[in-house]
């Protein structure tokens, strides 16, 4: 299960999606909808991964697709390890 909370950041002109649980299976499609619906026209999108406990291949592919356009914060050690290839691939460019 994945819980997705939305917090607008009026001062910064962006928004934060806070995730709790597993980014996997059907929840990846739900996350994509939330991301597309909440992505600001102007400003930055931040995704808070503090309470993410698992990311499957579909979840990693989603983060790989959006990573250049978002800031990922508060990664647990587990999530950070799973996302290392995504971050390395984009930071190397």
What does each model-identified segment do?
Residues 1-18:
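Short beta-strand/loop segment at the start of cytosolic alpha/beta domains
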Residues 19-92:
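Amphipathic alpha-helical interaction surfaces in cytosolic regulatory modules
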């Amino acid at each position: 299960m994945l819980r997705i909370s939305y917090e607008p950041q009026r001062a910064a002109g962006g928004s934060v999606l806070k995730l709790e649980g597993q980014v996997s299976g059907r929840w990846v499609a739900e996350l994509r909808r939330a991301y597309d619906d909440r992505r600001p026209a102007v400003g930055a999108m931040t995704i808070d991964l503090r309470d993410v406990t698992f990311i499957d291949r579909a979840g990693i592919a989603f983060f790989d697709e959006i990573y250049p356009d978002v800031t990922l914060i508060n990664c647990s050690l587990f999530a950070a390890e799973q996302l290392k290839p995504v971050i390395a691939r984009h930071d190397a460019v």
